Amino acid sequence: MEKYNFKQIEEKWQNEWKSKKLFKVKPKKNKKKYYVLEMFPYPSGKLHMGHVRNYTLGDVIARFKYSNGFNVLHPMGWDSFGLPAENAARENNVHPKEWILKNIDTMKAQLKKMGFSYDWNRELSTSDKNYYHHEQKIFLEFYKKGLVYKKSTHVNWDPVEECVLANEQVIDGKGWRSGASVEKKLMPQWFLKITKYAQDLEQSLKDLKFWPEQVKTMQKNWIGKSKGLRINFSLDNKEKNIEVFTTRPDTLFGASFIALASEHPISKEYTKKNKEVENFVKKCQENLNLQEEEFEKLEKIGIKLPFNVIHPVTKEKIPVYIANFIIMEYGSGAVFGCPAHDQRDFDFAKKYSLNIKQVIKPYENIKLEKAYTGDGKLINSDFLNGLNVKEAKEKISKFLIKKKQAKTKIIYRLKDWSISRQRYWGCPIPIMYLKDGTAVPATDKDLPVTLPDDIDFSKSQNPLKDHPKWKYTKYSKTGEDALRETETFDTFFESSWYFARFCSPNSKDIIEKKEAKYWLPVDQYIGGIEHAILHLLYSRFFTRALHDCGLLNIKEPFDNLLTQGMVCHKTFKDEKGDWVSPVDFDEKKNKEKFLIGKSEKMSKSKKNVVDPDLILNKFGADTARLFMLSDSPPEKNLEWTDTGIKGAYKYLNRLWDLVTKNLNILSKEKKCSSKCTVKKASFI
């Protein structure tokens, strides 16, 4: 009996698929399409087991759909711009392009060895000018639509990467990649108006029937819809008024002060009139450089302005402060303080001996030693007395709106997307500056704006800024001298539309409409839940923006979303406390010399990774794929064990033996071997 020779078998069938061009696909009117896509990888050098699991899940779905008569699109490409390539260039004295291309060759060979059903004719790389040429066109389309603008703002600055981060790239006050504590810095930045789509992005989440609830909840919370009122408080002895935003109009009768942001127009007005106010405002604006967590921990302080406002119902006079805990970006930059029912207001009122008036009584008799923020019955609130919080909100809102003292208002936590990055290895922003400083978009004749190859990383973190020639150009419309924008796109720009480019990767158009109409949306998308807010939200925004530019006929990019679990492995430390690779651990021989830690996500830093090449060479691709599919549900973490992979290998051997022993029963033809041929290659 012939033994299970996985190398011979896998090589045979992979060559068969290649020669028959089995996975090459094009639109077919008489066949129903199915588009399977796994999040494409950054070409870091080698595949890891997380990749293997992700791509195995996608591959089995693709093959299943093909076997059920679908016309299956299953592409692969490379998210190849980004900081790691630039850092590698600095450390190893190699050009980022060279480093990336070498890594792509290595990883592509690994993927082919795994036997995945990719249509390699559609392969794309985001650092290829044929890709980012069209990306620059997209930027200019967005520019025409008014979705692009530039302004100076306090941005998230990663001191390690020396680069700006979007709000979504700051996790618990630290850079998502470097882990460094992020600082705030005032800088001019290019932005995309994702906030224009905030309402649609939030409301449409309910239509994503086949997305994990956890992902939808994360996006909903990040978009952060708040429904409230804008209430007018008139200034005493003046015709002006202060517009205050609140989500708690039920507490209006407990208002004892108004707090303004340091950037509020009235704050700026009094800065010019009073030196003490000017100094306080400067101090407040320094605090804007802090991360959100640090900002919240600040002592709540303020400075009183020389006027009051009139309460819209009771007509009582209420003092006005500039306060360090109010920001202009939220609401109207002004709030009314109700100390009894907001802890921040409570702390402020205590400090400045302001009135603390309770207007909500808890259902249970409890002693209030701090602000009460729960439900209850309204007290000390005139015509609201006896109502619960919800009823009180509705009644006071109707009252104020009828009196034309308030308007309903919906605001969102979501901020516009900062896309400027102070790095070389990214897509150049197609903007140039004329002598008078005017920013003008590049014309079609100017595209693509390509990166220079002759760069010097020794001078600064951004070689484009210091390049002796590259930044100097001509504005093609007038022929006058101009300077190129020396910043590049956030790399999430590239990954926000690649799924659409896969439909026609070689087209001269940004997106070939006929192909896109046939293939999109993606029927099954697969990737980690860590991308819930970043990539997945940006892709939803891009799809809407591309739709509004007339480039797509869909608004949602992905019908079904599978967020696969991580591949985990036990961790090991030696007697010194240093991480040790599982390869160096032998439980029978030297268990006493090692500390066995908990199972964690595979990572190079903890040395608990398993090299896919070792598994492929020892057990074969089918064994690796079988283990990835059989040991844990796709959404759950998969525990990597030697016994598990060996068990999958033994199972395939038994399956091979079962079939080869009974070939005379299964087929009338003579005994088949791994060297036999078939009349037609099969997708599965």
Describe the residue ranges of each PLM region.
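Non-catalytic terminal extensions that flank enzyme cores
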Residues: 1-46, 189, 201, 214-226, ...
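Conserved oxyanion/phosphate-binding beta-strand-loop segments in alpha/beta enzyme cores
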Residues: 1-37, 66-75, 98-108, 210, ...
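Residue patterns forming the tRNA-binding/recognition surfaces of aminoacyl-tRNA synthetases
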Residues: 3, 12, 16-20, 91-242, ...
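Amphipathic alpha-helical
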Residues: 14, 194-226, 261-303, 444-475
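Short, solvent-exposed turn/loop segments enriched in Gly/Ser/Thr/Pro and often Arg
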Residues: 29-31, 40, 75-84, 123-131, ...
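Conserved active-site neighborhood of enzyme catalytic/cofactor-binding cores
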Residues: 42-73, 171-176, 253, 329-361, ...
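Catalytic alpha/beta core of large soluble enzyme barrels
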Residues: 58, 71, 264-368
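Conserved catalytic alpha/beta cores of large enzymes that bind or transform nucleotide phosphates
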Residues: 281-306, 359-364, 383-390, 394-402, ...
